[in-house]
Amino acid sequence: MVEQSKVPSSSLCPPDKIIFDEERGEYICTETGEVIEERIIDQGPEWRAFTPEEKEKRSRVGGPLNQTIHDMGISTVIDWKDKDAMGRSLDPKRRLEVLRWRKWQIRTRIQSSIDRNLAQAMNELERIGNLLNLPKAVKDEAALIYRKAVEKGLVRGRSIESVVAASIYAACRRMKMARTLDEIAQFTKANRKEVARCYRLILRELDIEVPVSDPKDYVTRIGTLLSLSGITMKHAAEIIEKAKNSGLTAGKDPAGLAAAAIYIAALLNDERRTQKEIAQVAGVTEVTVRNRYKELTQELKIQIPSQ
């Protein structure tokens, strides 16, 4: 059935009996078979969407919103190529004029204190995200968390760097991206203690729920960076699963447990890596790897072949 407003007024067929044939571009009466109107141009999209999110994603009207840009990418930008619409280079006088326009355009984009804060924060977030090789989805989540923190006034009296780092860590935890607080803190001016304090504040004030970190989430990343085989990584995951069942993981740093499991699995599969190598990649200390190694081998009765 088609909408009443779309039915030709000259038709005697009841509106609920009229259908639209998309392939032929015709309005047809289902009772009589009469072609009421033909050669209709369908002005709707050729794609289908079943949810508002899908509709927004597939729509080609305007650019997509980008959480990692302070104004979400909805403002215009004057190109730096200094060329006209025909692709010809501008003369020096015109180039200076465009330069002045560009400066004023940038100033109008960042007017309020919140705009300046977001502009600085999004640049910092993009920088840290690139250094950590985070996917766009995680960076978008971190940007959304930071924006909520700004709306709540949580940034006031705190450094932008520490709140950005805390937002990134919260996003990583929410999306099960294996990154430790130490890894993130090393790429920012803020110290680890300050980032941890901001992280706890964000969780409490924004009522954000994060899943408990699973040591197995760290195994693939650590193993890949150490160029270990899939068999060794699978063995490490099995060791962690046994440790969970034995209650050895409660209250322990997941990165440290994953590092120790990787160390044990590498020894058992003759892909030896030093504790120092593994500790550096996992972002933990050698002492942590050594202590977790002793606990796992003793409690799980794992026999390590003599070196």
From Swiss-Prot:
InterPro entries: Cyclin-like_dom, Cyclin-like_sf, TFIIB, TFIIB_arc, TFIIB_CS, TFIIB_cyclin, Znf_TFIIB. GO terms for cellular component: transcription preinitiation complex. It comes from the Archaea. One of its GO terms (molecular function) is TBP-class protein binding. Gene3D superfamilies: 1.10.472.170, Cyclin-like. It holds the Pfam family Zn_Ribbon_TF. The keyword Kinase does not apply. GO terms for biological process: transcription preinitiation complex assembly. Sequence repeats lie at residues 123-206, 217-298. The keyword Transcription regulation applies. Keywords: Repeat, Transcription, Transcription regulation. Stabilizes TBP binding to an archaeal box-A promoter. Also responsible for recruiting RNA polymerase II to the pre-initiation complex (DNA-TBP-TFIIB). HAMAP family: TF2B_arch. Belongs to the TFIIB family. This is Transcription initiation factor IIB. The lineage of its organism: Archaea, Thermoproteota, Thermoprotei, Sulfolobales, Sulfolobaceae.
